[in-house]
């Protein structure tokens, strides 16, 4: 832990009202900066040294969290516009210490979500056809392949897509999603929250158990298996393929059980809302700080399912090269170039139902700063196509999504 202490003396001309306003704003810091721990403040009561009139003390888990707080725009604005005009002198001390075992006051101010999405498990009727589709059109690299199962990866993570041969299916269907978790401690907390909320705790899929550290699975209100784990296996190098995704960013869920689904992912798993399209969709972020690592949309008379998986490409040029491949092969582009209002990414969507959900290939998906991660307030945008794709010219232009 890092303890940060600031002692200060107010200027003689500062009024009681000004002093009270300053101290009230300081006391509001823990709400505005959730990374803070054990914030305390007060008037100096020392009989040995009365040089400073007030002080406050706060703790952070890491030096980086302290640095992010000090460099953040909110903090710098407060210091320049509120603190310095009223303070004549100050002293600052920061030091590292080890908290006592069992000290519950060092717990985070907010519950942590999973870190980020790692993979989707998809059952498909023709596994070889889907492998060929994902290699050519998405840029994934095939790593392991049997008649029953295949693993494909985007970057160094063991896999981004796991395919299961299901010849009895007419179309592909996503049966599970996997999210990594930062630590055993966070994983244990997540498992307790899931159990306390009345959801069943399951073992990870047998093969997945061998590919990670600790973990567990549960089932969301729609029947989708959610696997949570630490220490996902990695390759030493990324695939030696120039045009490929860098990361699997998020799943987009469509559900006829919207409220219960939102409650599960937000209240139980701890995902943070980033933006709302009112009456339609909520975008959630996790600890990897993407604008959204999960999106949940109300049923549009299409059933309940994983509607798409988003992959981040290296550049807009690579997005367009993949689009050119789709046009060349005559592969269906379900939704052409979209300039997203929420994530600021530009993307297009491929969809051949036999291979499962739509595959979104995007560039420049917004990543929050550490300060934004803790302080961002979600927008409430009306259900207007221009609040989904800012290139749409009119409020009734709902086609082509």
Model-predicted segments: where are they?
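Conserved active-site tyrosine of GNAT-family acetyltransferases
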Residues: 130-135, 194, 223, 261, ...
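N-terminal beta-strand motif that seeds the catalytic metal site of vicinal oxygen chelate
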Residues: 2-7, 105-128, 174-179, 231-259, ...
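Short S/T/G/P-rich N-terminal loop/turn motif that feeds into the first structured element of a domain
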Residues: 1-53, 61-71, 94-105
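Conserved short beta-strand elements that form part of the metal-binding/catalytic scaffold
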Residues: 39, 140-173, 224-232, 276-306, ...
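Short secondary-structure junctions
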Residues: 29-38, 85-86, 197-199, 329-332
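Core segments of cupin and vicinal oxygen chelate
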Residues: 20, 112, 121-159, 209, ...
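Vicinal oxygen chelate
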Residues: 92-94, 103-110, 116-125, 168-244, 247-256, 282-285, ...
